[in-house]
Amino acid sequence: MAKIGLFFGSNTGKTRKVAKSIKKRFDDETMSDALNVNRVSAEDFAQYQFLILGTPTLGEGELPGLSSDCENESWEEFLPKIEGLDFSGKTVALFGLGDQVGYPENYLDALGELYSFFKDRGAKIVGSWSTDGYEFESSEAVVDGKFVGLALDLDNQSGKTDERVAAWLAQIAPEFGLSL
């Protein structure tokens, strides 16, 4: 079994694309395939000691799911399935996609929601990211002046995505016992 579980929720496929680009940097012994949370069980998810989780922020700051007009279930429906799990001793890194120009008042709020969910259940959250280079009004994903995970804006800053992903993975690798 792979050491790191890589899971995402997606509506348009952008978060899936980023998850797959993360996976390409690791072999199968190190990281699972990029797995959509609408296709896994709580047991699949819970078996990993290390997790990398991705989400877009939809509409007015929502997680993807049926109530935010997604065609398929996503994080909104998956989180209740794992809310009884204890994540103490697990290390979690988060990445989020959002549109800082179109939705500056709730940029990456869904990332903040994932952060709170896993932190409240004992997970060690790693991979905070600087807010430098972003222009937004507010975000639930900012704690102590930094994003709680990798912040990506494929709508307005797609040219920075590969560089940001590489730098973030280098930052979190030691937390997962890896070297890049």
Curated annotation (Swiss-Prot):
It comes from the Bacteria. Residues 4-173 form the Flavodoxin-like domain. Transmembrane segments: none annotated. Belongs to the flavodoxin family. Its cofactor is FMN. This is Flavodoxin 2. Flavodoxins are low-potential electron donors to a number of redox enzymes. NifF is the electron donor to nitrogenase, and is thus implicated in nitrogen fixation. Does not function as an electron donor to nitrite reductase. Signal peptide: none annotated. The gene is nifF. One of its GO terms (biological process) is nitrogen fixation. GO terms for molecular function: electron transfer activity; FMN binding; oxidoreductase activity, acting on NAD(P)H, quinone or similar compound as acceptor.
